[in-house]
Amino acid sequence: MSTHSNHPFHLVDYSPWPLTGAIGAMTTVSGMVKWFHQYDISLFVLGNIITILTVYQWWRDVSREGTYQGLHTYAVTIGLRWGMILFILSEVLFFVSFFWAFFHSSLSPAIELGASWPPMGIISFNPFQIPLLNTAILLASGVTVTWAHHSLMENNHSQTTQGLFFTVLLGIYFTILQAYEYIEAPFTIADSIYGSTFFMATGFHGIHVLIGTTFLLVCLLRHLNNHFSKNHHFGFEAAAWYWHFVDVVWLFLYITIYWWGG
């Protein structure tokens, strides 16, 4: 940020990452379309590699600006907070579309579905087995990330480390159970609107859990390198907000799709 002078505002240097990120996104989507049409997966893999490398180096630069260069002033931090809040709001609206599709189909099932929900021939999951365990796991992870945050505010380095470690562990455990549930599922994404809405909603939530787990893992590594203090730790706060958002979305998914809709 050489353009930064004696003022608090957020002016950034020229960066290649928006361009490489756009190239990575375009390559990933193009590769996905090819893959879905029975072509090879190489373009999709290349796009993912470009995107992951871009995200890593972009966030590395942001961490350097805030940790080593001292460029994240109060005004900049306020802007970052609003950016994260608006990002989470956009994610909320993203999931609203999935719930809308689900309720549109389930509250008045079409005659082609047997005028019933779940549709005729669909064997739904028992909400009191793996889904209930996953709910308990995510609720527990919400407790551990809050524990880590309060410990950080009290300058308790070891308890912050423990809280973040257990949160990441619970996130990985949730993902493993979700993958097992998908493998054992008695229906597929092609089995009527029920399969489509189920796998779209829970699948995108699963992707968000993976992103949140990665976010918290980065926070754990940064904490071990003393990047956070009790007064300056917005990276951790953003990860905690995102994780609580993931928790709340899962509660709605569990209550509506697994319990009521099953």
Curated annotation (Swiss-Prot):
<feature type="transmembrane region" description="Helical">
    <location>
        <begin position="163"/>
        <end position="183"/>
    </location>
</feature>
<feature type="transmembrane region" description="Helical">
    <location>
        <begin position="240"/>
        <end position="260"/>
    </location>
</feature>
<dbReference type="GO" id="GO:0005743">
    <property type="term" value="C:mitochondrial inner membrane"/>
</dbReference>
<dbReference type="GO" id="GO:0045277">
    <property type="term" value="C:respiratory chain complex IV"/>
</dbReference>
<keyword id="KW-1278">Translocase</keyword>
<keyword id="KW-1133">Transmembrane helix</keyword>
<feature type="transmembrane region" description="Helical">
    <location>
        <begin position="39"/>
        <end position="59"/>
    </location>
</feature>
<feature type="transmembrane region" description="Helical">
    <location>
        <begin position="83"/>
        <end position="103"/>
    </location>
</feature>
<comment type="subunit">
    <text>Component of the cytochrome c oxidase (complex IV, CIV), a multisubunit enzyme composed of a catalytic core of 3 subunits and several supernumerary subunits. The complex exists as a monomer or a dimer and forms supercomplexes (SCs) in the inner mitochondrial membrane with ubiquinol-cytochrome c oxidoreductase (cytochrome b-c1 complex, complex III, CIII).</text>
</comment>
<feature type="transmembrane region" description="Helical">
    <location>
        <begin position="198"/>
        <end position="218"/>
    </location>
</feature>
<feature type="transmembrane region" description="Helical">
    <location>
        <begin position="120"/>
        <end position="140"/>
    </location>
</feature>
<keyword id="KW-0999">Mitochondrion inner membrane</keyword>
<comment type="function">
    <text>Component of the cytochrome c oxidase, the last enzyme in the mitochondrial electron transport chain which drives oxidative phosphorylation. The respiratory chain contains 3 multisubunit complexes succinate dehydrogenase (complex II, CII), ubiquinol-cytochrome c oxidoreductase (cytochrome b-c1 complex, complex III, CIII) and cytochrome c oxidase (complex IV, CIV), that cooperate to transfer electrons derived from NADH and succinate to molecular oxygen, creating an electrochemical gradient over the inner membrane that drives transmembrane transport and the ATP synthase.</text>
</comment>
<dbReference type="InterPro" id="IPR035973">
    <property type="entry name" value="Cyt_c_oxidase_su3-like_sf"/>
</dbReference>
<dbReference type="Pfam" id="PF00510">
    <property type="entry name" value="COX3"/>
</dbReference>
<dbReference type="InterPro" id="IPR024791">
    <property type="entry name" value="Cyt_c/ubiquinol_Oxase_su3"/>
</dbReference>
<keyword id="KW-0472">Membrane</keyword>
<dbReference type="InterPro" id="IPR000298">
    <property type="entry name" value="Cyt_c_oxidase-like_su3"/>
</dbReference>
<dbReference type="InterPro" id="IPR013833">
    <property type="entry name" value="Cyt_c_oxidase_su3_a-hlx"/>
</dbReference>
<dbReference type="GO" id="GO:0005739">
    <property type="term" value="C:mitochondrion"/>
</dbReference>
<dbReference type="GO" id="GO:0006123">
    <property type="term" value="P:mitochondrial electron transport, cytochrome c to oxygen"/>
</dbReference>
<keyword id="KW-0496">Mitochondrion</keyword>
<comment type="similarity">
    <text>Belongs to the cytochrome c oxidase subunit 3 family.</text>
</comment>
<dbReference type="InterPro" id="IPR033945">
    <property type="entry name" value="Cyt_c_oxase_su3_dom"/>
</dbReference>
<protein>
    <recommendedName>
        <fullName>Cytochrome c oxidase subunit 3</fullName>
        <ecNumber>7.1.1.9</ecNumber>
    </recommendedName>
</protein>
<dbReference type="GO" id="GO:0004129">
    <property type="term" value="F:cytochrome-c oxidase activity"/>
</dbReference>
<keyword id="KW-0812">Transmembrane</keyword>
